[in-house]
Amino acid sequence: MTTDPSVKLKSAKDSLVSSLFELSKAANQTASSIVDFYNAIGDDEEEKIEAFTTLTESLQTLTSGVNHLHGISSELVNPIDDDKDAIIAAPVKAVRRKIERDPNAPKKPLTVFFAYSAYVRQELREDRQKAGLPPLSSTEITQEISKKWKELSDNEKEKWKQAYNVELENYQREKSKYLEAKKNGTLPPASLENGPTHAPVPIPFSLQHAAEPPVEKRPHDDDGSSEKKKKKKKKDKKKDKSNSSI
């Protein structure tokens, strides 16, 4: 086995390049598989939840591996001058121009499952905060949302679907108004303050208007009413006396 440092360095470099190539190839295959898997799911919400849960866990594993790779690469010394010339510069990708969205344009409401997820996520956060418990991780939240959605009855799920349909109809009306105003040139100046900042979250009416606790009467209100009754009785007695004297 050779002990020449330059040979060992070249061998290590070749191994690293080969590993990175395999990693890139695997990432491309994973992305393609995700698209195929998502397209094969269809409209089954429960299967989508399972898919998102699996995807979240896989991405966290991948992120951990990439961070580990980054830590190792940052510790490597710079290559010697002879090897610098052998490194092939990676092609510079053209920067995609970000399409600017008109702030005045209405935002499409979140779909049924994402609206439910947003509602439950906020509910979990508030409940744990009130109980003095630490916040859940992203994976734990996703699993809890999946569990709660599966436990919902068909009737409850239908309420979420109805809420989405209401918001969707409202969005379509607002979109028609927006397109008409844009066509006529009557849109207000583009400003984040004028337009919607977040996509509407369709929530069932029953959850929007939960029963509020009855307002307790203040003690002085009762005292005041009883005091008025006493005064009225005194007046009635005076009237009776005056009538009897006549």
Swiss-Prot record:
Protein's GO biological process: chromatin organization; chromatin remodeling; chromosome condensation; chromosome organization; DNA topological change; nucleophagy; positive regulation of double-strand break repair via nonhomologous end joining; rDNA chromatin condensation
Ranges of compositional bias, category Basic and acidic residues: 214-227
Domain of life of the native organism: Eukaryota
UniProt keyword annotations, A-Z: DNA-binding, Nucleus, Transcription, Transcription regulation
Region (Disordered): 179-246
One term of GO molecular function: double-stranded DNA binding
Family annotation (PROSITE patterns): HMG_BOX_2 (PS50118)
Biased composition (Basic residues): 228-238
Gene3D superfamilies for the chain: High mobility group box domain
Compartment(s): Nucleus, Nucleolus
Misc. remarks from the entry: Present with 19000 molecules/cell in log phase SD medium.
Quaternary structure annotation from Swiss-Prot or TrEMBL: Interacts with FPR1. Interacts with an unidentified DNA helicase. Associates with rDNA.
Name of the protein: High mobility group protein 1
Organism: Saccharomyces cerevisiae (strain ATCC 204508 / S288c) (Baker's yeast)
